[in-house]
């Protein structure tokens, strides 16, 4: 079998960077660098088509599944899947998607269990001979290049979504080092395929909006570098965003120790052009990863002091000449790609040469630099480490040691652990800051922290010993300091720091231009400046609830006690703060929409009715019209702000289901001197299916805009209480019925020139954003931390639409030309 006869194999020499759909980001980049003359160890890729062939052609019966899983088949999601599955065999892909579609990715336990079952199925099923035979032949050819029957190789997974700009999937799938023999290679390729379904990879795809059924996996098989020293380099400083600096991390043995964060590596900063070594931090390198001496293959972690000698622990890994050699190689690779790179490198102890084993674009680079945070004299520094992700975070400490404990970390906690491995991503998203004992600034965990915009300090050596769950700390992710307690002066600077460091800051400095506006949801006036700093095109939802309920008393009772003026003043102050922060960008204020159970818990709420399902009860515009004193106070507050010159405010009525509700609300507004359509824009929420169905009648009553409240619209359309765990798995904002309602409303609104938007949770979901752009929505309102991501997704989808339109036009023109002849 010669190379040209391969169906599922591609050699590096045959690949370029555009081959991501075929061999994934890792494989495509290795091919690109090979052809650019970069010293890359030779190898081949088992293409994504092989994985696709495997899952779409291997048939599995119910009995096969039960036999593979044993007792596990009788409980949880898989038991439900088996109960509803047809008797005839199904493809592996059908089994996988059935399990995934029933999985709530935010339920850590369920996610871990279900993805483990998928991996077990993949690893237990036999690889088709058509693929296995090609792998054996290619491995034989690669070995013969070096005059051997078998050589050591690294088998790395390469996902087809791995290095897309908006999704830092780095390290989400597995790598197997020092693999020897064709059978072992085949086994590791299957393990790579299975690693597409780790909990962390599945969680990432879900949160980044990737369709699970369309992400495939290639496996890279590459000659192993017998590393004496290795590491990672960033050709732009990932902490300060300085593109004139190269950051190099280095340690002994294989690079796995640096990437995983098992060791705190040496760190060198090199200035581009002058090649001056600006900074050297020589770390205590306690451990290293080597080829397992007992089995002759695979890897093992050993202590540096025992394997190399005590003097090697604090010895500089790279000579100054090698530091510059590595830096220059990084610059060469960056120049080739035209963008800063995240590169894994190694020196081979057999020939002493430098090799590049991987390169990918830095996906977390921002256009702005973080403002320095001054050290606070009166605060007590209790830990020092490496600032891995800039910003200030403060909160209650939760110490965990492995992924089984991640549910202990609640929203706003400070996550403390030995090293934050990728399995902890769900907890990292909830944390206000992250502190680790080990790891460097180029470890995978540090990269993910920067991507999530969460302050992180790594390599403190003793965080898990010094801190205990329940302590309170303040974390400075820029300087690498951890302070005892909540340091007020730093926390007060947090808003400014976050505005500089958050993903949205880059957008504010150099916004992507999109036809679809990207707005932001605001719950509290206190965060208005931070929300405005995201570069959002306005506020698609300003919630009234926090401002009104923060008075600490039932608002109707408050008014009856003669305090209406005080309520109006408080409301006006909050609305003005947001209107000013965004002026002249529009701010849509949604009138009060708190359910009765929230009112009942307040002082003075004793007379609130007991409702079995408050979400279907006395709330929104229904209550506003029944208790017009509430609506009147809100409109008076808006009028005060308008009279100060803020003409960027819109009024949005929640839970509208009849034209009469719009008419009556306008009458109340006019009673206080607020003129709809003149003083303020006037709009409604589309949350009730009835509103979507009679949208034309509602428009004729006079509205300027509508906004989809997808949380309620989905619940009401599907008759699902998403807080009921028995049916929550059926909750789906992309259900065809929900999308049909949205599509209908957008179509009718376009006919009448009414602006359309969305402000539900779905507005922060990339998958939903792509759908909405294609449906022609005018704007999408996202949560502050999702604005940049949604803007990137919108820009990408709009480019696709333009490209599709251009291609269609070109085809039509070609057909017209053919008709002429």
From Swiss-Prot:
Q: Which family does it belong to?
A: Belongs to the PEP-utilizing enzyme family.
Task: Give binding positions for substrate.
Answer: 543, 590, 687, 709-712
Q: Which co-factors does it depend on?
A: Mg(2+)
Instruction: Print the miscellaneous field.
Output: The reaction takes place in three steps, mediated by a phosphocarrier histidine residue located on the surface of the central domain. The two first partial reactions are catalyzed at an active site located on the N-terminal domain, and the third partial reaction is catalyzed at an active site located on the C-terminal domain. For catalytic turnover, the central domain swivels from the concave surface of the N-terminal domain to that of the C-terminal domain.
Key words of the record: ATP-binding, Kinase, Magnesium, Metal-binding, Nucleotide-binding, Transferase
Kindly list the biological process annotations in GO that this record carries.
Answer: gluconeogenesis
Classification via SUPFAM superfamilies: Glutathione synthetase ATP-binding domain-like (SSF56059), Phosphoenolpyruvate/pyruvate domain (SSF51621), Phosphohistidine domain (SSF52009)
Q: Which GO terms describe its molecular function?
A: ATP binding; metal ion binding; pyruvate, water dikinase activity
* Entry's free-text remark on domains: The N-terminal domain contains the ATP/Pi binding site, the central domain the pyrophosphate/phosphate carrier histidine, and the C-terminal domain the pyruvate binding site.
**Class in the EC hierarchy, top level:** transferase
What this protein is called in its record is Probable phosphoenolpyruvate synthase
What is known about what this protein does? Catalyzes the phosphorylation of pyruvate to phosphoenolpyruvate.
Spell out the reaction equation it catalyses.
Answer: pyruvate + ATP + H2O = phosphoenolpyruvate + AMP + phosphate + 2 H(+)
Enzyme Commission identifier(s): 2.7.9.2
Q: One Pfam family for this entry, by name?
A: PEP-utilizers
Q: Which InterPro entries does the record associate with it?
A: ATP_grasp_subdomain_1 (IPR013815), PEP-util_enz_mobile_dom (IPR008279), PEP_synth (IPR006319), PEP_util_AS (IPR018274), PEP_util_C (IPR000121), PEP_util_CS (IPR023151), Phosphohistidine_dom_sf (IPR036637), PPDK_AMP/ATP-bd (IPR002192)
Species assigned in the record: Pyrococcus horikoshii (strain ATCC 700860 / DSM 12428 / JCM 9974 / NBRC 100139 / OT-3)
Residues that hold Mg(2+) according to the record: 687, 712
Q: Which residues form the active site?
A: 444 (tele-phosphohistidine intermediate), 759 (proton donor)
Q: In which pathway does it act?
A: Carbohydrate biosynthesis; gluconeogenesis
């Amino acid at each position: 079998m010669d190379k040209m006869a391969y169906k599922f194999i591609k050699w590096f020499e045959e690949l370029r960077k555009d081959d991501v759909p075929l061999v994934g980001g890792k494989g495509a980049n290795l091919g690109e660098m090979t052809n650019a003359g970069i010293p890359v160890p030779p190898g081949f890729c088992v293409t994504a088509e092989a994985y696709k062939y495997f899952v779409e052609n291997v048939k599995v019966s119910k009995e096969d599944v039960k036999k593979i899983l044993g007792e596990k088949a009788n409980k949880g999601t898989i038991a439900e899947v088996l109960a509803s599955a047809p008797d005839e065999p199904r493809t592996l892909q059908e089994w996988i998607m059935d399990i995934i579609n029933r999985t709530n990715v935010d339920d850590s336990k369920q996610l871990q269990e279900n993805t483990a079952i998928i991996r077990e199925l993949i690893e237990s099923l036999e690889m088709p001979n058509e693929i296995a035979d090609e792998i054996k032949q290619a491995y034989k050819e690669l070995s013969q290049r070096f005059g051997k029957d078998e050589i050591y190789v690294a088998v790395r997974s390469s996902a087809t979504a791995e290095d897309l700009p908006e999704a830092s999937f780095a390290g989400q799938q597995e790598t197997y080092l020092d693999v020897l023999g064709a059978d072992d290679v085949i086994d590791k390729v299957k393990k790579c395929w299975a690693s597409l379904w780790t909990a962390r990879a599945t969680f990432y795809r879900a949160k980044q909006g990737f369709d699970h059924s369309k992400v495939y996996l290639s496996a890279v098989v590459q000659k192993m570098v017998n590393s004496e020293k290795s590491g990672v380099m960033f050709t732009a400083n990932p902490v300060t965003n300085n593109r004139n600096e190269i950051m190099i991390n280095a340690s002994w043995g294989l690079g796995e120790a640096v990437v995983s964060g098992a060791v705190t590596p040496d760190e060198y900063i090199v200035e581009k052009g002058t090649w001056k070594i600006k900074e050297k931090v020589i770390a205590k390198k306690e451990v290293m990863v080597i080829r397992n001496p007992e089995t002759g293959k695979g890897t093992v972690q050993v202590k540096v002091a025992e394997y190399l000698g005590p003097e090697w622990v604090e010895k500089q890994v790279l000579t100054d000449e090698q530091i510059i050699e590595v830096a220059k190689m990084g610059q060469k690779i960056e120049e080739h790609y035209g963008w800063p790179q995240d590169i894994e490198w190694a020196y081979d102890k057999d020939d002493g040469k430098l090799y590049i084993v991987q390169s990918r674009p830095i996906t977390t680079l921002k256009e702005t630099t973080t403002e320095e945070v001054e050290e606070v004299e009166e605060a007590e520094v209790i830990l020092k480490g490496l600032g891995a992700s800039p910003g200030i975070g403060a909160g209650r400490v939760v110490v965990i040691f492995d992924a089984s404990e991640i549910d202990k970390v609640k929203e706003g906690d400070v996550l403390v652990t030995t090293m934050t491995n990728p399995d902890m991503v769900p907890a990292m998203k909830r944390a206000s800051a992250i502190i680790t004992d080990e790891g460097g600034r180029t470890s995978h965990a540090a990269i993910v922290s920067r991507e999530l915009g969460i302050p992180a300090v790594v390599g403190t050596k003793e965080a898990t010993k010094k801190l205990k769950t329940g302590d309170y700390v303040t974390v400075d992710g820029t300087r690498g300091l951890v302070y005892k307690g909540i340091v007020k002066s730093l926390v007060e600077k947090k808003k400014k720091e976050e505005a500089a460091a958050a993903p949205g800051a880059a957008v504010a400095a150099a916004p992507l231009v999109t036809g679809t506006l990207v707005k932001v949801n605001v719950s509290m006036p206190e965060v208005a400046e931070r929300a405005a700093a995201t570069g959002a095109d306005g506020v698609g939802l300003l919630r009234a609830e926090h401002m009104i309920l923060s008075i600490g008393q039932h608002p109707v009772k408050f008014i009856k006690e003669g305090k209406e003026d005080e309520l109006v003043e408080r409301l006006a102050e909050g609305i003005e703060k947001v209107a000013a922060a965004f002026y002249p960008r529009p701010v849509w204020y949604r009138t009060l929409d708190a359910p009765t159970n929230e009112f009942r818990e307040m002082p003075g709420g004793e007379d609130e009715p007991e409702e079995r399902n408050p979400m279907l009860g006395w709330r929104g515009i229904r209550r506003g019209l029944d208790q017009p004193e509430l609506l009147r106070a809100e409109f008076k507050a808006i009028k005060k702000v308008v009279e100060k010159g803020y003409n960027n405010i819109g009024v949005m009525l929640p839970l509208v289901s009849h034209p009469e509700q719009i008419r009556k609300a306008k009458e109340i507004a006019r009673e206080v001197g607020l003129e709809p359509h003149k003083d303020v824009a006037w709009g409604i929420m589309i949350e009730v299916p009835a509103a979507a169905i009679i949208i034309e009648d509602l428009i004729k009553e006079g509205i300027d805009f509508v906004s989809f409240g997808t949380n309620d619209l989905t619940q009401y359309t599907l008759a699902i209480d998403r807080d009921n765990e028995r049916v929550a798995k059926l909750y789906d904002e992309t259900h065809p019925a929900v999308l049909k309602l949205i599509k209908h409303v957008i179509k009718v609104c376009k006919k009448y020139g009414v602006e359309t938007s969305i402000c539900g949770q779905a507005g922060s979901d990339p998958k939903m954003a792509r759908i909405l752009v294609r449906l022609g929505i005018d704007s999408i309102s996202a949560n502050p931390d999702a604005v940049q991501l949604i803007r990137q997704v919108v820009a990408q989808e709009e480019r696709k639409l333009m490209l599709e339109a251009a291609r269609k036009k070109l085809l039509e023109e070609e057909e017209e030309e053919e008709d002429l002849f």
